[in-house]
Amino acid sequence: MGSVQLSGSGLVASLPPNHSFSHKTKLNKPNSYFFRSKHNAARTKTVRAISTAPASQPPAADEPDEPPAVDFAFVHSVLLPDGTPDVHWRRANGGQKLRDIMLDSNIELYGPYSKPLSNCAGVGTCATCMVEIVNGKELLNPRTDIEKEKLKRKPKNWRLACQTNVGNPDSTGLVVIQQLPEWKAHEWNIPKNIPNDDDLETST
């Protein structure tokens, strides 16, 4: 079983930035464009306009800013032939269930339990929508009581997608999700000293 670094080459690829290019030209002799000789003035009297343009046009309105959204990196359970993670990038608004985001984005969630009547359709009783949170835990709600019961024998960073809320409508950030963690062919090198929600609750 291979080991995947969170900062490895397969996941370092970030979303392409938005580039804006501007080019300014400088007139060497700006006054020459406004200079008119008598000969030119006479010629302009014989010229008839066939189309007109408004003397002044309002400045172009700035493009509206994109609404806040959360970026997702969904990592498939099977690596690519070259051994790198098979990552699928998605973007969605916060304030939604992780299950809804994955299904709406055509991300595999249930694996062999995707057939009708093979899962509870998001109620939280079957525990077949398990995912592993690799990064971005701070954008998610704490584990629910249902998760604590259903996942008590699973690693602390495993969640049920149907019980996981992703931030608020104005949230931004990156969440890295391991799909189908029970069938993954690799392991994540995640620091062990990161506190989890259960530890924080027991210490208070």
UniProtKB/Swiss-Prot annotation:
GO terms for molecular function: 2 iron, 2 sulfur cluster binding; metal ion binding. One of its GO terms (cellular component) is cytosol. [2Fe-2S] cluster binds at residues 120, 126, 129, 162. Disruption phenotype: Malfunction of the NDH complex. The keyword Metal-binding applies. Keywords: 2Fe-2S, Chloroplast, Iron, Iron-sulfur, Membrane, Metal-binding, Plastid, Thylakoid, Transit peptide, Transport. CDD domains: fer2. Transmembrane segments: none annotated. Residues 1-48 form a transit peptide. One of its GO terms (biological process) is photosynthetic electron transport in photosystem I. Its main location: plastid. It is found in: Plastid, Chloroplast thylakoid membrane. Residues 1-24, 45-68 are annotated as: Disordered. Residues 76-180 form the 2Fe-2S ferredoxin-type domain. NDH shuttles electrons from NAD(P)H:plastoquinone, via FMN and iron-sulfur (Fe-S) centers, to quinones in the photosynthetic chain and possibly in a chloroplast respiratory chain. The immediate electron acceptor for the enzyme in this species is believed to be plastoquinone. Couples the redox reaction to proton translocation, and thus conserves the redox energy in a proton gradient. Part of the chloroplast NDH complex, composed of a mixture of chloroplast and nucleus encoded subunits. Component of the NDH subcomplex B, at least composed of PnsB1, PnsB2, PnsB3, PnsB4 and PnsB5. This is Photosynthetic NDH subunit of subcomplex B 3, chloroplastic. It comes from Arabidopsis thaliana (Mouse-ear cress).
